[in-house]
Amino acid sequence: MKRMNILLVMLLWVASQMQAQLVQENETAIVYYMPKTELVITLSYDCVEQIPGVFYQYAQRYLGAKNIVTEKKTTYRLNDMTLCTKASADTDRAYKVNAQKGYNTQLLSLTTDGRLAGYNIGYEVKGDKVKGEKQEAKAEKQEELMPLLEEQFMAGSVAKMAEGAAKQIYRIRETRLNILGGDVEHVPADGKAMQLVLDELDQQEQALVALFVGTTMVTHHKHTFSYLPADDVEKEVVCRLSKYTGIVDKNDLSGEPIYLTLKAHKQSLQTAYMVDPKATIPSQLYYNLPGTADISLQHQALSISQSITVAQYGVSIPLALDLFKSKQEYSIYMHPETGNILSIKQ
């Protein structure tokens, strides 16, 4: 037990010394960083815009309609929430490899932001895709002319125009029934031609009915933002959804809260000792033994839960110096997202 405690202290001291070191003037060294994990939260929501028809006051009288839009309004509703992760360099966990101490620094492979990707692997540097903070689908609306005939426009009053539009709707429905029943003078030549005629009649009817019951247009939107996991949190408000303005700031009480709960499972130096109890002579190359976290998001009745790997919850463990002093060449593959070892090959 005493030996184990001494080794744990040594590991902690070595890690702290490596992080404290800076590249001195005229010193040949490469600095690399452990990764840190960010949550990328995407909220999918709809904007529902309702516009009343010009004849909405006559919808019940002429069409017997009940679900009628009587006023113009816009509302928002949340459909889905998703979680994923992205990695970046953790500048608080920096290490260096000194060329004067027998390391071939040219064999080090780093990502564009300085995370360690491997040693002697010929890593191809690829830039991470940058995601926008907010992405929204846009819908363009065009003014449409009312689908009325000349005689309806000349009716002289809104009530007469509504009556004429209703009669036109019933004529369209009657024509459709006659075509389907074969009770027309000129029957469409084939099934495809008949379907084209029926589709045209449907469009005419929908346009006329909308003058009475109104229209509802739904546009789909996405809001994406990042969250950096730290300590445990219980129902932290990360943002809000307002029924009338959409996604708003977490301090805007006009919206209903979207909660995030996080339970961290951090690694310890005791775990590091269990990984390598022989405590071989450490090198200047460290890998990360990451931790995990249980994440949940909740908004009213909608909720999701997920377990993720979190790099900053891990501990740094030195690779054995023997790997670099051996006559055999080793290739060490690292996971740039977590800092952990993927594989070691001769």
Question: Regions from the language model: what does each represent?
Answer:
Residues 1-22:
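Bacterial Sec-dependent N-terminal signal peptides
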